[in-house]
Amino acid sequence: MTAATDSSPAVPPPAAARAAVAPAGGSPLVTTDYLGYRLASHFQPIYSLTHHRAVGHEALLRATSIATDVPVPPMELFASVDGDDARLSLDCASLRQHLAAYAGKDADEWLFLNVHPRSLASPVGPGIGEIAAALAAHDLRPEQVVIEVLESTLPDDADFDRRIDELRELGCLVSLDDFGAGHSNFDRVFRLRPEIVKLDRSVVVRAEVDAHARRIASQMVSLLHECGCLVLMEGIETDEGAYTALRCDVDFVPGWHFGRPAPALAGGAGLHALRAAWDRFDRQSATDDRLWQEQMSPYKQSIELASVLLAGGASIDEACRRFLSHPGSDMCYLLDKQGRQVVGNAFRDVVAHQQLESVQRFAPLRDTGQARWSRRAYFRGAAASPNIAQVTRPYMTLQGSRMCFTVSIQFDMGGRTLVLCGDASL
């Protein structure tokens, strides 16, 4: 790639990448001298939780002042150059450095490259031909390269969108970086159609300690999967973070817990941590599943009994008495085959009824006389498996500000198909 400012005397071009003297027994380190700094590359391994191995490495810039031999953080380095053209030139120089340092490495892995969106949006930025030539010069196929763009700095710019399309046509993959931080929104996912979305480290930090945040993270991952994206969770630095990533069903994980960035590729370093995370996940999943089944069994048995009693002519209050005796149970209701309620609710007791009715913030949702619940998982699950009790995942009920689960069963009563539902608060 040729920097946009190579022909400008104000921004001198970087020197070509060169092999520096390596430590004893090591391979030569490829570096680039640029405006008084020595640029080098470190590679952070990225693991597939499913494949149980490294599937790529992210190239991270390291810089040292040539005059003082003092390391300079990348953000400080970029802040030290004046003007967009200079930053564009530095961005291009770092890309060239990473390609040169990665050349000859494992062709079956991805190379993740950070590119500032302004570099791609700039009409004088590296064109698709220059990128293709730079890859070819280092014997790298476009399919090996994942171009990472920072989600928080994406421009609403036709030139940027065109460059993204050109990169994809060339064969590169596109990754949306730091999703879930700041003003993240799914419009950028819809617009750019990235193959990979990287969740910001703040997502895993919250999900590690907050069950509510963990549920949101899991649903975010599920939605991104449905959008056609693979999901990477950044910032895995602890056992708990690795376990959280597995629980949230993410695809890829980097992070110091699995391996620190280094000049050489070290994809095997994190396999022990990966095995440990899977061992914990397997043990905890088995325990959680057993406890959940034990906890739900009385509710399922009671809703099945209630359906038999209803079919035999009992009132909903009488039929659901046993279900409503269980801890957390709030109410039962009966739906027709279109999801409409056919009789009034059966409440656990007067107190439960009053508590549900007292949530004034949700008073506009209280009247369900014309409601249809056929879209809900508890209705669809029951309809798919008649006469077998179903249990939903926890969700926010429209009947008030609370999390609950619903137990449901479809059955026939006098020639009518009905679905009996029972809600219980968590």
Q: Each predicted region: which residue ranges?
A:
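Catalytic core of bacterial c-di-GMP phosphodiesterases, primarily the EAL and HD-GYP domains
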Residues: R87-D159
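EAL-family c-di-GMP phosphodiesterase catalytic domain
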Residues: M1-R38, H42-V55, R62-D69, V149-L154, ...
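Sensory/regulatory domains in signal-transduction proteins
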Residues: F43-L49, A54-I66, N114-P123, H183, ...
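Extracellular/periplasmic ligand-sensing ectodomains of membrane signal-transduction proteins
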Residues: M331-S385
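Short, small/polar residue-rich loop motifs at catalytic or cofactor-binding pockets
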Residues: L39-S41, H326-S329, C404-F405
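Extracytoplasmic/periplasmic sensory segments of membrane signal-transduction proteins
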Residues: M296-V351
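A short, polar/charged loop-to-alpha-helix boundary motif
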Residues: A63-V81, R260, A264-A266, R348-A371
